[in-house]
Amino acid sequence: MSAKEVRFSDDARSRMVRGVNVLANAVKVTLGPKGRNVVLEKSFGAPTVTKDGVSVAKEIELEDKFENMGAQMVKEVSSQTSDIAGDGTTTATVLAQAIVREGMKSVTAGMNPMDLKRGIDKAVIAAVEELKKLSKPCTDSKAIAQVGTISANSDESIGQIIADAMAKVGKEGVITVEEGSSLENELDVVEGMQFDRGYLSPYFVNNQQNMSAELDDCFVLLYDKKISNIRDLLPVLEGVAKAGKPLLIIAEDIEGEALATLVVNTIRGIVKVAAVKAPGFGDRRKAMLQDIAILTGGQVISEEVGLSLEKASLDDLGQAKRIVVTKENSTIIDGAGKPDEIKGRVEQIRAQIEDATSDYDKEKLQERVAKLAGGVAVIKVGAATEVEMKEKKARVEDALHATRAAVEEGVVPGGGVALVRALQALKSLKGANHDQDIGIAIARRAMEEPLRQIVSNCGEEPSVVLNNVVEGKGNYGYNAATGEYGDMIEMGILDPTKVTRSALQNAASVSGLIITTEAMVAELPKKGDSAPAGGGMGDMGGMGMM
């Protein structure tokens, strides 16, 4: 085990605070409508320009190990807030820095750090309750657009496109963000169930203009194994041909003789068929086939449930009003499944979401819910250059998270006003002793900091604006974009309650740990870290420079 360096009390804390300040100062310049950008160097390609707090925080790594520990702890504040609420990372960092700054002053003055922490925790609990009282539900499209606009750095087009997407696919619908190919943002809504598998042969195409296979009022055959022998398929094909309807086959794979026969039948016009591979892999594939079966009112032909392909009848097939299969995607529109069964399946998947541990699993399950329940909206971000594209895409994703948080827990006045109004709950709050009272005062001072920082980034005097806001009531606050005072809700400056709440709770949690630190242990820098110089090739006589 290598030797360690140990630092104690003020020496340890002062180094940690230096690290906290380096990270927080880099992050807080981005706060508010007049916040500035931060440019991040990349090991290859163009640098990234961002106004997203967590993106800046993630890039910061300090040389001094003790300073770096402080920076990493505050980085945890913004990461946690981003994971829980999807936005509010800069606010959380500003709050954390303020609590650490005020807390360290008190610790240096001889206060008990544990009592200070207890006082801060008490204040945060009271402030969170007050925020919940201030919160108003966010249900209409206008409020959703306003939340998205604020989160996307006052870009109204982003706020509006997110509101449109939510209106079309519902609050539960899946909204994905992709890089577009034009200069403008575009919204593409896919109704019905779409999955990322295209036709297995271009000979299935019947719409040459769109290069797609379009099947109206058709049957759907679902099979969980490979189909290579056409004899297994013949009973189904004959039944479909007699019914005079098209057929979509979804199987693990269709190859060889079976695929060739389907192509020949399609070309000759005997039966209109399209074949695609089943979506997903492994257990997820089985689950998605079952989703499609419930959506179309059919049955997955599987030996696990005692069904075989050669004995399948038309009763086992699903049906849909319309199916469109392109080279890359298949879309099933208006399946013939029973609404009760679809609803039951959605509830079942929602229960699985509650139990899921990984974010990836949750996301995939959420997609399945959306595909069964409504549809999928794709926001295609447009920009002139790749650098702008990346920055804009990050803003759209932030705004999307913020609007989801707003729908979940409601909204409060933005611009730091909600935290100032929540101070009302701390006026009469008392701790168990004097040091806890100081902890409550630290939280009170820290909760003013986001408003002060927003004003400071505008080049105005923070104390003057803060006093004016404190004298006002309700939603009265300062619009940093225009320099006017007024009702923040009416001016469309809203923050999701979940974002403000998470920022305060996470900042207090990590800051409390920092101010109660008494010793720090870090690895000693290794001597002679740089690699030894390699042996030269000696004097190569006779090879003079040209």
Curated annotation (Swiss-Prot):
Record's subunit section: Forms a cylinder of 14 subunits composed of two heptameric rings stacked back-to-back. Interacts with the co-chaperonin GroES.
Disulfide links within the chain: none
Name of the protein in its database record: Chaperonin GroEL
Name of the gene this protein is made from: groEL
Keywords from the named record: ATP-binding, Chaperone, Cytoplasm, Isomerase, Nucleotide-binding
Compartments, record wording: Cytoplasm
GO terms, biological process: protein refolding
A GO molecular function held by the record: unfolded protein binding
Region (Disordered): 526-546
HAMAP family: CH60
Family in the record: Belongs to the chaperonin (HSP60) family.
Broad class of the protein's primary localization: cytoplasm
Entry EC no(s): 5.6.1.7
Compositional bias segments (type: Gly residues): 533-546
Organism: Thioalkalivibrio sulfidiphilus (strain HL-EbGR7)
Function: Together with its co-chaperonin GroES, plays an essential role in assisting protein folding. The GroEL-GroES system forms a nano-cage that allows encapsulation of the non-native substrate proteins and provides a physical environment optimized to promote and accelerate protein folding.
Signal peptide: none
